[in-house]
Amino acid sequence: MASEQAAESYTVEELVAVNPYNPDILNDLEGFVNDQVSNQTYNLDANLSLLRLYQFEPERLSVQIVSRILIKALMAMPGPDFSLCLFLIPEHVQMEEQFKTLIVLSHYLETARFRQFWDEASKNRNILDVVPGFEQAIQSYAIHVLSLTYQKVPRPVLAEAINIEGLALDKFLEHHIANSGWVIEKGARSQLIVLPRNEFNHPELKKNTAETVPFEHVTRIFPVLS
């Protein structure tokens, strides 16, 4: 009883930091996953801790909770979170249909096959809709990928990548013009969306490494070389 009262005085993050392998916190971690879903927050360390505990106590594994963890991990792309989580999930669990679907979706995102991703996602709304913000997170990831390649994105390419068309796309563009520095140009066949400059779509912005080393760091190297 005393230990339970002591545990209640700590946050889930603190419990994980103190002893991530404590099976007594498994229920707390499951509740924390549901909190992340409802509050649209995210804590990879806590979720990994829960998946490790499931390895030690497989009979307590909740398929619903694991599914939510993987969906939240997909939303964290381009981070490696999905792979980190999947590594801790037993193969026989991965063979369940909903997990095979999430693995396919992950592959489409990693290879920037956005049309295939949205087609597959539309067939599995029952899995994905339980996690608010999923669609918006993937749209942000798609824009990130486009910004690594394009200086100017044709409107149809953007529409396919984020799965938005028509008036909804017009409103989406208006928002990013006002808040993200996007600019619209007229192209020969369609609108072009000019994305903010970065070192990937404008390589000239990427400075030579030598140019970015402060002089005081260079002077510290000389005694070592001599």
Swiss-Prot record:
Keyword list, A-Z: Cytoplasm, Initiation factor, Protein biosynthesis
Pfam (any one): CSN8_PSD8_EIF3K
GO molecular function, one term: RNA binding
Gene giving rise to this polypeptide: TIF3K1
Keyword Protein transport: no
Compartment(s): Cytoplasm
Subunit field text: Component of the eukaryotic translation initiation factor 3 (eIF-3) complex.
Descriptive protein name: Eukaryotic translation initiation factor 3 subunit K
InterPro entries found in the cross-reference section: ARM-type_fold, CSN8_PSD8_EIF3K, eIF3k, PCI_dom, Transl_init_fac_sub12_N_euk, WH-like_DNA-bd_sf, WH_DNA-bd_sf
Stated family: Belongs to the eIF-3 subunit K family.
